[in-house]
Every structure is written in C-alpha cells, then in structure tokens.
Amino acid sequence: TKTEEGEFISEGGGVR
C-alpha cells in the first residue's frame, strides 16, 4: 500500500 504522498506503508501499519 502507498500513501497519497507516495511513501510505502504496511497494511494496518501507517508508519511513515
């Protein structure tokens, strides 16, 4: 999954 900012995050994580 990727954020709108284009950074990768794990599912159910949300770590930036």
From Swiss-Prot:
Its main location: secreted. It is found in: Secreted. GO terms for biological process: adaptive immune response; blood coagulation; innate immune response. Conversion of fibrinogen to fibrin is triggered by thrombin, which cleaves fibrinopeptides A and B from alpha and beta chains, and thus exposes the N-terminal polymerization sites responsible for the formation of the soft clot. The soft clot is converted into the hard clot by factor XIIIA which catalyzes the epsilon-(gamma-glutamyl)lysine cross-linking between gamma chains (stronger) and between alpha chains (weaker) of different monomers. Forms F13A-mediated cross-links between a glutamine and the epsilon-amino group of a lysine residue, forming fibronectin-fibrinogen heteropolymers. One of its GO terms (cellular component) is extracellular region. Keywords: Adaptive immunity, Blood coagulation, Coiled coil, Disulfide bond, Hemostasis, Immunity, Innate immunity, Secreted. A long coiled coil structure formed by 3 polypeptide chains connects the central nodule to the C-terminal domains (distal nodules). The long C-terminal ends of the alpha chains fold back, contributing a fourth strand to the coiled coil structure. Heterohexamer; disulfide linked. Contains 2 sets of 3 non-identical chains (alpha, beta and gamma). The 2 heterotrimers are in head to head conformation with the N-termini in a small central domain. Cleaved by the protease thrombin to yield monomers which, together with fibrinogen beta (FGB) and fibrinogen gamma (FGG), polymerize to form an insoluble fibrin matrix. Fibrin has a major function in hemostasis as one of the primary components of blood clots. In addition, functions during the early stages of wound repair to stabilize the lesion and guide cell migration during re-epithelialization. Was originally thought to be essential for platelet aggregation, based on in vitro studies using anticoagulated blood. This is Fibrinogen alpha chain. It comes from Equus asinus. The lineage of its organism: Eukaryota, Metazoa, Chordata, Craniata, Vertebrata.
